[in-house]
Amino acid sequence: MTLPLAGRTALVTGASRGIGAAVARALAAAGARVGLVSRATDQLQALAATLPHEPVVLPDDLTHAPAAVTVAAGALEAFGNAPDILVLAAGTFPLGPVVGTTDADLDTAFALNAVAPLRLVREFLPGMRSRGAGHIVFLGSVADRYVFPTNAVYAATKHAARAAAEAVRAESRGTGVRTTLVSPAATDTPIWDPHEPDAQAHLPNRDQMLRPEDVADAVLWAVTRPAHVDVDELRLSRS
């Protein structure tokens, strides 16, 4: 049986845990050679040891501007070209009232959730266009439309990510490069650990959340559609 992504390459940010790790597993299981990006080197190496098709470990901190260039250079060296699939799953999840939010909170959240994806797209989109094919997946959130008290910073970054995805899609129309925004509801990953959602009345219990594999399934479905099919956006919620 031929795997749907056999011979393809993919780069996944935030791949050390949670949704990013689940996406990396799903793409590798479908035949892709996967590049793994995160600052958690040990976790990346542990994940890589479980994946087929010679995964590539590219540890870096995407909150720093030079990281996009370094990651791109490593991916180009390993793959020989821009990846066929770029999944922008790295993110941070600050919660708290606006009053009391620190400059560090703001800088980190926007750097990782909003700015880093654009830096990576800037590095890889020209190669995808020259090849006439590529697929960029932005990991969004229902917070790009739904805002509640204490998630002002996170929601603002995800509104920015939505705008970026829509702009990249519009700028790439007719080039063979597709862009998909995948926006899940609350998903049970370690990103929730500091917030103890089961103890907070305004937050969903963890057993009511999506699983990382649910989101990975959606990403895999989007990137395995025929080349003439654009999946602009997928919004996922728990039934």
Model-inferred region functions:
Residues 9, 16-17:
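Conserved glycine-rich cofactor-binding loop
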Residues 97-98, 105-110:
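Substrate-binding pocket helix/loop in short-chain dehydrogenase/reductase
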Residues 99, 148-152:
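Active-site loop immediately N-terminal to the catalytic Tyr-X3-Lys motif
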Residues 121, 157:
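Active-site helix of classical SDR
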Residues 30-47:
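Conserved glycine-rich Rossmann-like NAD(P)H-binding loop of the short-chain dehydrogenase/reductase
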Residues 141:
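Residue(s) in the substrate-gating loop at a strand-loop-helix junction
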Residues 174-182, 202-239:
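C-terminal helical subdomain
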